[in-house]
Amino acid sequence: MIKLILGLKITIIKLITFDLDDTLWDNGPTIANAEIFTRKWIEKRVGRVEWGNFDDFINLREDLIREDPSIAWDISKLRKEIFKKKINHLVTSSEAEVIANDAFNMFINKRHEVELYDGVANALKSLSMDYSLGVLTNGNADIYRFEIGKYFDFAISSLEAKDSKPNRPHFDKALQKIDGISFAEMLHIGDHQINDIFAANQLGIKTLWFNNKNTKWVQAFEKPEDFSDWKKLPEIIEELYE
């Protein structure tokens, strides 16, 4: 925003970037519903599948990433590979390929059935009038599939960055999207203490921590300003940076 100092206009913040999952919406129920729906859809086509527990899922995920490190940031491809691994002993390899692709399409549609936190849409509308807005996400949600997408100037996923936060490529690419800005003129908002707050902080980017679950701050560096109510966000930013 713009501040008047000795008659001169000084811009403090030009760009605000946002995490998506668990920042704009509660991602846990969304992913759980998408997973349940997709598994039922698959089993109608191949019969009963041994899905295993959460530890099994994580172990399979890690095995697949060891086989192909690039899918660590291509999580859409990773999920397709997980589906294939789970059913390839039940159908032919070509059938597994088709079913996995179709299943992923079902999953990704359900994955976008989110419920925004109260106040998100109005806050983004208000902020977009004064700032450039961007998305920096490790996930595969597409902000432009939502009505609120119209408020954003760009969105960078791990697939585009070819890396994941807390590494810096997301933030470097954000600078390339808006001409003439520096990290010092950015504000990043997210829920994750490492992937969002630490990542931005170490680059000199200003941060706001979304903490709607009253989570304890456990990092070695100073706790940033936080908020839990999206309806208050424009006012908080105005107080801090105008």
Region locations from a protein language model:
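Asp-based, Mg2+/Mn2+-dependent phosphohydrolase catalytic module
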Residues: M1-I16, G28, S94, A121, ...
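N-terminal helical cap/lid subdomain that shapes the substrate entry/recognition surface
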Residues: K9-D118
